[in-house]
Curated annotation (Swiss-Prot):
The modification Leucine amide is found at L158. GO terms for biological process: adenylate cyclase-activating G protein-coupled receptor signaling pathway; adenylate cyclase-modulating G protein-coupled receptor signaling pathway; insulin secretion; neuron projection development; neuropeptide signaling pathway; positive regulation of cytosolic calcium ion concentration; positive regulation of ERK1 and ERK2 cascade; positive regulation of gene expression. This is Pituitary adenylate cyclase-activating polypeptide. The modification Lysine amide is found at K169. Residues 25-80, 173-176 form a propeptide. It comes from Sus scrofa (Pig). InterPro entries: Glucagon_GIP_secretin_VIP, VIP/GHRH-like. One of its GO terms (molecular function) is neuropeptide hormone activity.
Amino acid sequence: MTMCSGARLALLVYGIIMHSSVYCSPAAAGLRFPGIRPEDEAYDEDGNPLQDFYDSDPPGVGGPASTLRDAYALYYPAEERDVAHGILNKAYRKVLDQLSARKYLQTLMAKSVGGNLDGGAEDDSEPLSKRHSDGIFTDSYSRYRKQMAVKKYLAAVLGKRYKQRVKNKGRRIAYL
């Protein structure tokens, strides 16, 4: 369980980092902060950035998806992406293996406890609860029967002892 939660936590942290770095970065979203100016941009006298006509595509050629893809490729080279995807795939496979193993063990336990080999999904919970309540009743009843047998035995033994004492007129005889 600890390993599974650790893998889930690693997967969650990795997903949050990748999401925030790709989709929430100012360059990918096209946001500009007025107090922060990149040093390689040119500005006019009003402080507005000048458009770079040599590096940019004409308007309408590239959509937002291509811009996002270009920004992703710029910030994360292919080698780093492959390593990150490999780590993610390894952690994801480990989590899936643990989940499938847990599910397999649960089905084995349900079959061994329930004795149901045809694997009906709706019949799994009913026999287990019925068997559980039957077991509780049987256990309580057998405990009650044992207590009654002990009381009956003690009453018989102590009754005989009392009768023997009366018969022997006070002489003590050890019976137990």
